[in-house]
């Protein structure tokens, strides 16, 4: 059950994300090719230290008992979130290199940082829709001897939210799903009239589908 402080932080995060234009209503196409009436652009959080720290705190609180020894943010948006968590909670971090250019394939380093094979690494991401980026990151980490069991995300866009990912069965925990984000936006009470109408329509559709 969510405590008062978590509920307050969730409300603050939704309010600021909407105010800075990170939450948008209307037709949008996701990187996965899926069409959505609700778009969340987490790239904007890097320009708002307040919302960055709030989102990072909420993500970290999904796992109050930490038993992984490393963090890795999915390139690129989640790198700032993972860094924020690493600094605040003193958890070592590794970096997955997404592009390898002008390097000898035999010397290509996919994961930067200090680590020992066999260590468990917790993956951090801003959101998950298809799960492809989390799986790719997990594969790179595992190829370097690290163990990946879990990913923490701010928003799980999947219809079957919080279901395990990939053949590894990576557990996914999220601050919001689309239905809970819509409810939080409506509860926020300061949506424009047009956005409120769309939010209510999305809420009705989600209730029918459930």
From Swiss-Prot:
This is Orotate phosphoribosyltransferase. Its EC number is 2.4.2.10. Belongs to the purine/pyrimidine phosphoribosyltransferase family. PyrE subfamily. PANTHER family: OROTATE PHOSPHORIBOSYLTRANSFERASE, URIDINE 5'-MONOPHOSPHATE SYNTHASE. 5-phospho-alpha-D-ribose 1-diphosphate binds at residues 97-98, 125-133. GO terms for biological process: 'de novo' UMP biosynthetic process; pyrimidine nucleobase biosynthetic process. GO terms for molecular function: magnesium ion binding; orotate phosphoribosyltransferase activity; orotidine-5'-phosphate decarboxylase activity. Pfam families: Pribosyltran (PF00156). InterPro entries: OPRT, PRibTrfase_dom, PRTase-like. Catalyzes the transfer of a ribosyl phosphate group from 5-phosphoribose 1-diphosphate to orotate, leading to the formation of orotidine monophosphate (OMP). It comes from Chlamydia pneumoniae (Chlamydophila pneumoniae). Its cofactor is Mg(2+). Orotate binds at residues 129, 157. Homodimer. Gene3D superfamilies: 3.40.50.2020. Pathway: Pyrimidine metabolism; UMP biosynthesis via de novo pathway; UMP from orotate: step 1/2.
